[in-house]
């Protein structure tokens, strides 16, 4: 019997595993991942941005964890020889309406404690000669990294400390009892743990349902489609270039991202995926689609954002529409500059009343902890999220009448926080 089993080999699961074994070095800990390696889904299909925390509600978990995670991610990369580029982010306003929205973002960045610089049109042009706008906000702490590399390094540390990673282990059933949890896999394996931690991303709600519980949310998969610019445009921007988002819309808009390999990507958009892991336009699952359309919460989301949703679908099918979005601030790009690039799928939790759950969300039972909503900036925030989960583990252990083996904490969660806040 394991002391802890973690489900999910993305960056949240690996960060949690790495920090849990740091706090409890004598614990028997296993991580189950349904794929043949780590970071195969959201972690390995995002833009790689180290976010600063510009957009998030002051005081929210997203705001707190993103600010701490920005520092922690860079510190982890420095300690483990992982390359990153602290290139900074430029938020660009292209209309008077966007200038008003930019002023609101300026106030929010101040509330979140983020260093930033206000630029007029001339100053913007000096920094970014190929970008057109009325003004901008420069955020120097934003950067770029390969989260696949970060996750692989976390896995290596976890294993070096005695943790066990079991790949090709897709969880198909869970049974919670007073002394622990039984985990069954589609491959025929069966594992038992005193405490279970689920970091299951796109499958988060289904893991809660396996316990016979009503999760109170449903995961809605949104595909984010990207293009890569032709190589001759690898130097077209000096920073990450973001539009000013519409506060009525749930996503940030199409942006230019300088990748860690030197290439530049355009995207992502946000299109409803008709399969939980539907990375291609043609991917379709009848059961997943039935589940999506059968959810009153998702139907309300689609109704509330019908016009923008149809626009996203149109631009997904017609590259010229996608191009127009980026030409608003980078007019020199043409259709021939947009080359295919792999898409990602966001796991967005939706409430029964049709709200996109805005903050990170965790659900606990006497023997389990579930990470239920961890969209962007979860990759940036992975280290503080992992520490937060370890803190929840300690609370859970203290409340259990029969916690199993007595485990000695080698360090406190406060020490984890202190380490990545230095």
UniProtKB/Swiss-Prot annotation:
The keyword Ribosomal protein does not apply. Its EC number is 1.1.5.13. The lineage of its organism: Bacteria, Pseudomonadati, Pseudomonadota, Gammaproteobacteria, Enterobacterales. One of its GO terms (biological process) is L-lysine catabolic process. Catalyzes the dehydrogenation of L-2-hydroxyglutarate (L2HG) to alpha-ketoglutarate and couples to the respiratory chain by feeding electrons from the reaction into the membrane quinone pool. Functions in a L-lysine degradation pathway that proceeds via cadaverine, glutarate and L-2-hydroxyglutarate. Also displays some oxidase activity in vitro on L-2-hydroxyglutarate with O2 as the electron acceptor, but this activity is most likely not physiological. Its cofactor is FAD. It catalyses: (S)-2-hydroxyglutarate + a quinone = a quinol + 2-oxoglutarate. InterPro entries: FAD-dep_OxRdtase (IPR006076), FAD/NAD-bd_sf (IPR036188), L2HG_DH_bact (IPR030862). GO terms for cellular component: cytoplasm; plasma membrane. It is an enzyme of class 1 (oxidoreductase). Keywords: Cell inner membrane, Cell membrane, Electron transport, FAD, Flavoprotein, Membrane, Oxidoreductase, Transport. PANTHER family: L-2-HYDROXYGLUTARATE DEHYDROGENASE, MITOCHONDRIAL. This is L-2-hydroxyglutarate dehydrogenase. Belongs to the L2HGDH family. GO terms for molecular function: (S)-2-hydroxyglutarate dehydrogenase activity; 2-hydroxyglutarate dehydrogenase activity; flavin adenine dinucleotide binding. It comes from Escherichia coli O17:K52:H18 (strain UMN026 / ExPEC). It comes from the Bacteria. It is found in: Cell inner membrane. Pathway: Amino-acid degradation.
């Amino acid at each position: 019997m394991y002391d802890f089993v973690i489900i999910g080999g993305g960056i949240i699961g690996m960060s949690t595993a790495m920090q849990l074994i740091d706090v409890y070095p004598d614990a028997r800990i296993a991580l189950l991942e349904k794929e043949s390696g780590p970071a195969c889904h959201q972690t390995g299909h995002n833009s790689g941005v180290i976010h600063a925390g510009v957009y998030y509600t002051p005081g929210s978990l997203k705001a707190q964890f993103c600010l701490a995670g920005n520092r922690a991610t860079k510190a982890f990369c420095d300690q483990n020889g992982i390359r990153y580029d602290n290139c900074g982010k430029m938020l660009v306003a292209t209309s008077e309406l966007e200038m008003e929205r930019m002023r609101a973002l300026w106030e929010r960045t101040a509330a979140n404690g983020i260093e930033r610089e206000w630029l007029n049109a001339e100053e913007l042009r000096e920094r970014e000669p190929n970008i057109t706008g009325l003004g901008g906000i420069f955020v120097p702490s934003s950067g770029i990294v390969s989260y696949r590399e970060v996750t692989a390094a976390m896995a290596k540390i976890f294993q070096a400390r005695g943790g066990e990673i079991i790949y090709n282990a897709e969880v198909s059933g869970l049974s919670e009892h007073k002394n622990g949890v039984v985990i069954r896999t589609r491959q025929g394996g069966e594992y038992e743990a005193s405490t279970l931690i689920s970091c299951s991303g796109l499958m988060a709600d289904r893991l809660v349902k396996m316990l016979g519980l009503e999760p109170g949310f449903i995961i809605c998969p949104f595909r984010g489609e990207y293009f890569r610019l032709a190589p001759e445009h690898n130097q077209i921007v000096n920073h990450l270039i973001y539009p000013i988002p519409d506060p009525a819309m749930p996503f940030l808009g199409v942006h230019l991202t300088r990748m860690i390999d030197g290439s530049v990507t355009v995207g992502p958009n946000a299109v409803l995926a008709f399969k939980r892991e539907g990375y291609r336009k043609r991917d379709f699952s009848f059961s997943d689609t039935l589940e999506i359309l059968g959810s009153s919460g998702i139907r309300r989301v689609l109704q509330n954002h019908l016009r923008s949703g149809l626009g996203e679908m149109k631009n997904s099918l017609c590259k010229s529409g996608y191009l127009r979005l980026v030409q608003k601030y980078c007019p020199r790009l043409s259709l021939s500059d947009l080359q295919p690039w792999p898409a990602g799928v966001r796991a967005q939790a939706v409430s029964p009343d049709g709200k996109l759950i805005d903050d990170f969300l965790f659900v606990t039972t006497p023997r389990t902890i579930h990470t239920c909503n961890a969209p962007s900036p979860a990759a940036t925030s992975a280290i503080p999220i992992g520490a937060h989960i370890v803190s929840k583990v300690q609370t859970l252990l203290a409340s259990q009448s029969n916690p199993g083996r007595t485990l000695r904490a080698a360090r406190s969660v406060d020490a984890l926080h202190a380490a990545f806040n230095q």
